[in-house]
Curated annotation (Swiss-Prot):
Organism: Bacillus subtilis (strain 168)
Gene: yosG
Name of the protein described by the UniProt record: SPbeta prophage-derived uncharacterized protein YosG
Domain of life: Bacteria
Amino acid sequence: MILKEIAVYEETLNKHLPNETRMVLHYKNVEATENEDKITVRISNDLLVYKWVELGGVSKGTYKMKMTSLEDETSEVNVKIERIQMNSDRDLAVEIEFNVLNPFQSVVGVPGIHSFSIKG
């Protein structure tokens, strides 16, 4: 499916401040695939991923992912980064696979993400 927008946030805890939220990834018009408890995001050349390089590779922490469909339907899930596939020059990610920590239940009760009622 093609998503209108996808954003991934990292929540940090600070003793003196309430929870802070920092956006670590943001794309518009990106292709995403849902399969069981995984979301795979495929990135074209015009959607650069330098923010992941700044993070120093795969982080073991959890993130909050907000997805917006082309119909402006939104869904939010907690995810961990499962795998990042880089291009041949190793300077851009071309595919990022997320493991969903709180999968949705479909109408028929089959486990999986089933984020949006309208699939693109």
